[in-house]
């Protein structure tokens, strides 16, 4: 990554949410670098109005303001390819934050080139994974990019000091509409909403009921289950209950329905790439349904060894994304294999949603490898000769028999 003297930096493109941190960063960049700040705000389904970010940026004298609806690109080119892999980090985390960063980094770099900017900037702290994800993504796409990470440079180390800075610099932080300021650090997109900080910093403390925003508690979910039919084409959901939908529409609908049934709540302690453990709570209704349903259609259409190979490679794929290497040779290689495996992953999965649980209750496909004539417990009319199993078992047990014949005790 290239390094420049601050005096040579005249334009900076900032990933800007319009919130407290990035508003302060915008002003800090203007003062510290005496540079023009260009803001970029991405709508990736966070469920909030992004237009207020424009007014806040204008109030700080920012002339070039980019606000973009990236929901479809995010779902189509990032989330859906990841779900073809059934990716889960450390057995539980569906990578909701991890998968959102590459697209933002990509647009930061592209906007910087459009404006001939000297640097990009983000609001990720020096303790988290996001700084790594943003900067690895940026350097992979623009090797000479200069990234300014204020949290690693300034001395504003607490929420109180940030508020004092905002007051001193006449930065308007509008909390209107928030009757109760959340004690949590939250991040949302089409795939999930995350919660960190507050009482969650004690890993033994249970999250408060009023923290959750996207879902009801399973106990309060409807007493009647809801069934959905999800239609797949090459590993991607293309319709719900017969209604053709775009990828981002699929996620919006599944989030809404899943949330009503208490689907997708998660409370975990994860290992960050930077070395520390972190406790976080997540709501991922759509992702939880998508993962279960995708495994359901794959169980019918994927060859056994192809399915097992995917399962073996999945942890590596998930770790690659979690650590910030979406734009990397290894992710591209793994993606090519994964996408090839989805050639015949077509059909329909029927899922049941009930009080926090997702169950696959039916699956069908014209590309099914399930042969009822062979699998039946009834008369198979000679489709499968059970005597063939004797030789199969003998050959597979040969090495074990040889071990035992040499006096080796395999029972220990």
UniProtKB/Swiss-Prot annotation:
The record's annotation in SUPFAM superfamilies points to: Adenine nucleotide alpha hydrolases-like, Argininosuccinate synthetase, C-terminal domain
Instruction: Report the pathway entry.
Output: Amino-acid biosynthesis; L-arginine biosynthesis; L-arginine from L-ornithine and carbamoyl phosphate: step 2/3
Query: Record's InterPro entries?
Result: Arginosuc_syn_C (IPR048268), Arginosuc_syn_N (IPR048267), Arginosuc_synth (IPR001518), Arginosuc_synth_CS (IPR018223), Arginosuc_synth_type_1_subfam (IPR023434), AS_cat/multimer_dom_body (IPR024074), Rossmann-like_a/b/a_fold (IPR014729)
Q: Where in the cell is it found?
A: Cytoplasm
Q: What class of enzyme is it?
A: ligase
Q: Which residues bind L-citrulline?
A: 93, 98, 129, 133, 185, 194, 270, 282
| MF term (GO), any | argininosuccinate synthase activity
Entry annotated with the keyword Flavoprotein: no
Question: What's a BP term from Gene Ontology annotated to this protein?
Answer: urea cycle
Which UniProt keywords are present, listed alphabetically? Answer: Amino-acid biosynthesis, Arginine biosynthesis, ATP-binding, Cytoplasm, Ligase, Nucleotide-binding
Presence of keyword Transmembrane: no
CDD domains reported in the protein's UniProt record:
ASS
EC no. given is 6.3.4.5
Q: Binding of ATP: at which residues?
A: 15-23, 42, 123
Q: Which reaction does it catalyse?
A: L-citrulline + L-aspartate + ATP = 2-(N(omega)-L-arginino)succinate + AMP + diphosphate + H(+)
Gene3D superfamilies, alphabetized: Argininosuccinate synthetase, chain A, domain 2, HUPs, Single helix bin
Which Gene Ontology CC terms are recorded? cytoplasm
Q: What is its main location?
A: cytoplasm
The protein's matches in PROSITE patterns, at most eight in alphabetical order, are given as: ARGININOSUCCIN_SYN_1, ARGININOSUCCIN_SYN_2
Q: How does it assemble?
A: Homotetramer.
The record's similarity note reads: Belongs to the argininosuccinate synthase family. Type 1 subfamily.
Q: Which protein is depicted? A: Argininosuccinate synthase
Q: Which organism is it from?
A: Psychrobacter arcticus (strain DSM 17307 / VKM B-2377 / 273-4)
């Amino acid at each position: 990554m290239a390094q420049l003297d601050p005096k040579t930096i005249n334009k900076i493109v900032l990933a800007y949410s319009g919130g407290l941190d990035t508003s302060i960063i915008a002003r800090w960049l203007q003062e510290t670098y005496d540079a023009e700040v260009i803001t970029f705000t991405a709508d990736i389904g966070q469920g909030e109005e992004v237009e207020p970010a424009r007014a806040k940026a204008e109030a700080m004298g920012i002339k070039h303001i980019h606000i973009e609806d990236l929901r479809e690109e995010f779902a189509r080119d990032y989330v859906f390819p990841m779900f073809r892999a059934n990716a889960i980090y450390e057995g539980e985390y569906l990578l909701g934050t991890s998968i959102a960063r590459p697209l933002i980094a990509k647009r930061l770099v592209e906007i910087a080139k459009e404006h001939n900017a000297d640097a990009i900037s983000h609001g990720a702290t020096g303790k988290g994974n996001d700084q790594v994800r943003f900067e690895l993504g940026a350097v992979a796409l623009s090797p000479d990019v200069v990234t300014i990470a204020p949290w690693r440079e300034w001395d504003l180390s607490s929420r109180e000091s940030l508020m004092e800075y905002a007051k001193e610099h006449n930065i308007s932080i509008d909390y209107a509409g928030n009757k109760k300021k959340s004690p949590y650090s939250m991040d949302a997109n089409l795939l999930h909403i995350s919660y960190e900080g507050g009482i969650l910093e004690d890993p033994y403390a249970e999250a408060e009921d009023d923290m959750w925003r996207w879902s009801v508690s399973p106990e309060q979910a409807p007493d009647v289950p809801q069934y959905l039919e999800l239609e797949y084409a090459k590993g991607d959901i293309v319709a719900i209950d017969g209604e053709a939908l775009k990828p981002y529409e699929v996620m919006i609908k599944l989030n809404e329905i899943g949330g009503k049934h208490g689907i997708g709540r998660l409370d975990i302690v994860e290992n960050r790439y930077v070395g520390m453990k972190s406790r976080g709570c997540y709501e991922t209704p759509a992702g939880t349904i998508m993962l279960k349903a995708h495994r359901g259609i794959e169980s019918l259409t994927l060859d056994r060894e192809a399915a097992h190979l995917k399962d073996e490679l999945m942890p590596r794929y998930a770790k690659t994304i979690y650590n910030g290497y979406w734009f990397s040779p290894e992710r591209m290689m793994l993606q090519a294999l994964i996408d090839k495996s989805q050639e015949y992953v077509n059909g329909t999965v029927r899922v049941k949603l009930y009080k926090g649980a997702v169950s696959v209750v039916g699956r069908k496909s014209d590309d099914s490898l399930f042969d009822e004539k062979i699998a039946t417990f009834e008369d198979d009319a000679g489709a499968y000769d059970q005597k063939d199993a004797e030789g199969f078992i003998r050959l597979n047990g040969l090495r074990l028999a040889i071990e035992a014949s040499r006096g080796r005790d395999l029972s220990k």
